[in-house]
Amino acid sequence: MLELAYLQTLPQQRALLKADYADFIVKEDLGYAMTGEGEFVALYVRKTDANTLFVGEQLAKFVGLSPRNMGYAGLKDRKAVTEQWFCLQMPGKAMPDFSRFNMAGVEILQVTRHSRKIRTGSLNGNHFEILLRNAVETDELKVRLENIKNFGFPNYFTEQRFGKDGHNLTQAMRWANGEIKVKDRKKRSFYLSAARSEVFNLVVSERIRQGLANQVLAHDILQLAGTHSWFTADGKEDLALLQTRLENHDLQLTAPLIGETQQLACELENKLVERHQSLISLMKRERMKPARRPLLMQARDFHWEFVENGLKLKFYLPAGSYATALVRELVNIDENE
């Protein structure tokens, strides 16, 4: 992440992230309520230092199911305290006694029924509560906080997307260059996601470097705020009007998530993407579905408080955006190993 541009400038302070699991709290927002009836048993679970997939597998095992009959909306940080829903497909079966389920770091907060499987990606977003230890109240940091509240932060994919020490991206590059073959479906998915995230990040970073993170250009692809609807600034609408709508947060600039048939935007974007032909060829060859992603992101309900041992943050992000991308604009991160 160090080579990527900052929307503001390089932060002056260092702070410790995840010194304790409770310093990083995530609460899932599915955007819908459980129905209270149906063939799926739904469990709302609090996890501390626990892997999402492993917890789900253990819940399935506890009731005698295959992991295929278990569902969840998204993977959560392991080094954190996280709350999320799991579901188990159990048509016609009595509700199990989960009071006998015993797993270190796992607490079942609620058990109910639901009519549909909770599928990966079926969530609105996440609520975050983060403590940045050793952060000190200064004018510089207060300005950064206000800027994030008012203007947002680069919507980068962060280290989690690329694997430990960037392993997934390294393997994607080797695959793209013909150095390895990848047959395992799970690895293919991880490597392709890392490749696409890298190209997105580099496009966003270069646009920031050129001072164009908040500037509508001809042929930009814009997203209506709060939706997944896009349109192209192709001259039918006045660029000045689109710029006003962007500044009023009615629109968002987007950058590409490269796929098989990609609609690229402005001339700048085309030039940037051309630099990464090997990765792009790989993604097209593997027939990835193209998409767009907001270039900048604004946290909802963004609040902060300086406390004795650091800076407390509370905010909400839509699914797919990373809290560590926001934190990166505030402080240089020292992560507790």
From Swiss-Prot:
Keyword list (alphabetical) reads: Isomerase, tRNA processing
Q: Which GO terms describe its biological process?
A: tRNA pseudouridine synthesis
Q: Where is the TRUD domain?
A: 152-308
The active site lies at: D77
Per the record, the domain of life is Bacteria
Which major enzyme category is it? isomerase
GO CC, alphabetical: cytosol
Q: What is its EC number?
A: 5.4.99.27
List the catalytic activities from the record: uridine(13) in tRNA = pseudouridine(13) in tRNA
Kindly give the CDD domains that the UniProt entry links to this protein: PseudoU_synth_EcTruD
Gene Ontology MF: a single term: RNA binding
* Protein family according to the UniProt entry: Belongs to the pseudouridine synthase TruD family.
What exactly does this protein do?
Answer: Responsible for synthesis of pseudouridine from uracil-13 in transfer RNAs.
Known HAMAP family for this protein?
Answer: TruD
Q: Which NCBIfam families match?
A: PRK00984.1-4, tRNA_TruD_broad
Protein name (database record): tRNA pseudouridine synthase D
Organism of origin is Mannheimia succiniciproducens (strain KCTC 0769BP / MBEL55E)
